[in-house]
């Protein structure tokens, strides 16, 4: 399981499953390269594939889904910033091991993501923040410039 693999140990910050956002309104997949994915001292960059999913929900939530090997997904999620149109205020990380028998682990977080327009060529998604007071997270991905698939 990805949560075990990451050794996050943040059970105090787990958000109840019923708080997950419904009403997906858009999902894009872009290709490119993970620049960095890490939690605390665990560098997961080498486990990234060359795909990133970008999901938008009816309530304004956005999720950046960093696709990892073995069907694992590392998601950074939050609400669009009111001050900056290309920014998301991160409030959770979702760890999904890709198995239908296991529920994703949702961990409270604080941070932000910035991103560009994937339809205008190369762009970079950059996310950073904290899980609780002690553990930093970083996730960044650069697209190859090809248009996203829907």
Segments from the language model and where they lie:
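A short, surface-exposed beta-strand/turn
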Residues: 78-84, 137-150
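Residue-level signal for mature regions of secreted extracellular proteins and peptides
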Residues: 3, 27-28, 41-42, 106, ...
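Acidic, glycine-rich flexible loop segments
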Residues: 88-139
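Sec/Tat signal peptide C-region and signal peptidase I cleavage site
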Residues: 13-17
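An ectodomain-focused feature that recognizes extracytoplasmic/extracellular
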Residues: 18-89
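Bacterial N-terminal signal peptides
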Residues: 2-9
């Amino acid at each position: 399981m990805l949560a075990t693999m990451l050794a996050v140990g943040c059970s105090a910050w787990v958000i109840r499953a019923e708080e997950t956002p419904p009403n997906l309104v858009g999902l894009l997949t872009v290709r490119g390269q993970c620049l960095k994915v890490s939690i605390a001292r665990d560098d997961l960059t080498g486990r990234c594939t060359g795909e990133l999913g970008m999901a938008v929900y009816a309530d304004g939530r956005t999720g950046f889904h960093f696709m990892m090997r073995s069907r694992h997904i590392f998601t950074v999620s939050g609400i669009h910033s009111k001050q900056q149109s290309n920014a998301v205020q991160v409030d959770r990380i979702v760890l999904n091991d890709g198995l239908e028998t296991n529920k994703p682990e949702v961990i409270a977080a604080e941070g932000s993501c910035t991103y560009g327009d994937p339809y205008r060529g190369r762009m970079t998604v950059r996310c950073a923040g904290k899980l609780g007071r002690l553990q930093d997270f970083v996730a960044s991905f650069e697209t190859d410039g090809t248009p996203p698939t829907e």
